[in-house]
Amino acid sequence: CFIRNCPP
């Protein structure tokens, strides 16, 4: 992921 706290 590209936001705070998401793993991918």
Swiss-Prot record:
The keyword Endoplasmic reticulum does not apply. Its main location: secreted. Disulfide bonds join C1-C6. One of its GO terms (cellular component) is extracellular region. Keywords: Disulfide bond, G-protein coupled receptor impairing toxin, Hydroxylation, Secreted, Toxin. Transmembrane segments: none annotated. One of its GO terms (molecular function) is toxin activity. It is found in: Secreted. The modification 4-hydroxyproline is found at P7. Expressed by the venom duct. Is present in all duct parts with a highest content in the proximal part (part 1) (27%), part 2 (29%), and the distal part (part 5) (26%). Belongs to the vasopressin/oxytocin family. Targets vasopressin-oxytocin related receptors. The cysteine framework is C-C. This is Conopressin-Tx.
